[in-house]
């Protein structure tokens, strides 16, 4: 069954899941409001108001939180594009695409571990799915 699966289909599917991950990170994570919980509101207010010097720039923890969230979104969009392009390469030259597929697979496995340790179930599930798809694409790209 696995030998009949085309690596480019697996890569395109992983690519679309990366796009979904980027959209969820942005709209459900960065741009969503609070639950209204007083403790949560207090933490967010402190993150937005307490300033400190960061290498000569006055910043807040909110700046870092929001900025790193945007960095993650941009990186996931880049991965979406790269996996989509890698799918085209896997169609014509799977042996050349294979090391890149392996690198992305390892990265998403590491992302899943970090999400399990520091975040929550939604990114963890997406990252596990992407890692599995990439692992299958890696195995199928031998031919």
Language-model features and meaning:
Residues 9-37:
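N-terminal signal-anchor transmembrane alpha helix
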Residues 129-141:
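Alpha-helical transmembrane segments and their membrane-interface exit regions
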Residues 11, 15-22, 69, 73, ...:
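Residues within membrane-spanning alpha-helices of integral membrane proteins
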């Amino acid at each position: 069954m696995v030998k009949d699966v085309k690596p480019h289909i697996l890569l395109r599917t992983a690519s679309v899941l990366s796009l979904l991950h980027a959209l969820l990170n942005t709209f459900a994570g960065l741009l969503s409001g609070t639950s209204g919980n007083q403790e949560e509101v207090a933490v967010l207010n402190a993150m937005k108001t307490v300033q400190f010097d960061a290498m000569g720039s006055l910043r807040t923890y909110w700046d870092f939180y929001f900025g790193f969230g945007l960095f993650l979104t941009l990186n996931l969009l880049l991965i979406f594009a790269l996996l989509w392009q890698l799918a085209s390469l896997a169609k014509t030259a799977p042996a050349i695409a294979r090391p890149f597929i392996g690198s992305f697979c390892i990265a998403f496995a590491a992302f899943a571990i970090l999400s399990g340790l520091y975040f929550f179930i939604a990114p963890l599930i997406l990252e596990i799915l992407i890692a599995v798809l990439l692992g299958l694409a890696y195995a199928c790209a031998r031919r």
